[in-house]
Amino acid sequence: MKPVKTGTVHPVPSAAKQSGWRDLFYSKKAAPYLFTAPFVLSFLVFFLYPIISVFIMSFQRILPGEVSFVGLSNYTALNNPTFYTALWNTLEYTFWTLIVLIPVPLLLAIFLNSKLVKFRNIFKSALFIPALTSTIVAGIIFRLIFGEMETSLANSILLKLGFSPQNWMNNEHTGMFLMVLLASWRWMGINILYFLAGLQNVPKELYEAADIDGANTMKKFLHITLPFLKPVTVYVLTISIIGGFRMFEESYVLWQNNSPGNIGLTLVGYLYQQGLAYNEMGYGAAIGIVLLIVILVVSLISLKLSGSFKGEG
């Protein structure tokens, strides 16, 4: 008999090894990491990396083809009247927008949430439309409404009411009023939707029990509505603060760089002016870092005052 030739036998991967990666992919331990990976990657690429880069740039003098380390020179250069004017304008603008964009949307949301109001969807749509309007278009509309001519809409109304016309665009006080009014007009609808969403989560049984106990409207508002709206209120407060410190478009479309008494100069506008218009990238980066710190501090203070750091017991 001829000997039987045998070849090299290669081991076939076991089913367990073949399904190893599949089991890891579908395992409960890996699922949280897989779902959070897109957010973590986007956070690292679009948030953390730019912050680190800007922080490094704030200690440098950046010129075309030349980068030199200057230490704290960019930060010490912030000690000037123009920077303090921009900081004060930003704080004042943020304060007045908070005064408008927190209580007014809350009251309007309660009004729209009432069953007695007809055509609620029409009102909701009408209030949300300004948020979809381009800032440039909104700025042009406001420049026409509040023009310096007596024939402008705002001055025509004042004349009919017996008041003298105002030079809205060239006065510091009316200039701040215009910026706050423009921001309030644009973002009022969004805050209303936030509060409306919060009102939908308030149990109706609590209001019914309060009616049985004889509670009036104010007591129901203070002891039922407000406590349940606290998370939404804190969120709206936080994004409104951040939006206030980020303000640039409203001022730019109204005056560009020629606002009366520099009333339209904000921290973001000052950053744009120094970093891009004057090509002082290092100095602009220092302004950006200071802006980030101010936003973090103010946001933490607002969260602390609202009691968000207290443990629920």
Curated annotation (Swiss-Prot):
Keywords: Cell membrane, Membrane, Sugar transport, Transmembrane, Transmembrane helix, Transport
GO biological process: transmembrane transport
CDD domains: TM_PBP2
SUPFAM superfamilies: MetI-like
Residue ranges of domain ABC transmembrane type-1 in the record: 87-302
Subcellular location: Cell membrane
Keyword flag tRNA-binding: no
UniProt GO cellular component terms: plasma membrane
Membrane association type: Multi-pass membrane protein
Signal sequence bounds: none
Pfam family for this entry, one: BPD_transp_1
Keyword Cell membrane in annotation: yes
Transmembrane regions listed in the UniProt entry: 39-59, 91-111, 126-146, 176-196, 224-244, 281-301
Origin: domain of life: Bacteria
Induction remark: Transcription is repressed by glucose and by the binding of AraR to the operon promoter. L-arabinose acts as an inducer by inhibiting the binding of AraR to the DNA, thus allowing expression of the gene.
Subunit relationships: The complex is composed of two ATP-binding proteins (MsmX), two transmembrane proteins (AraP and AraQ) and a solute-binding protein (AraN).
Family: Belongs to the binding-protein-dependent transport system permease family. MalFG subfamily.
Described function: Part of the ABC transporter complex AraNPQ involved in the uptake of arabinooligosaccharides. Transports alpha-1,5-arabinooligosaccharides, at least up to four L-arabinosyl units. Responsible for the translocation of the substrate across the membrane.
Protein's name in the database: Arabinooligosaccharides transport system permease protein AraP
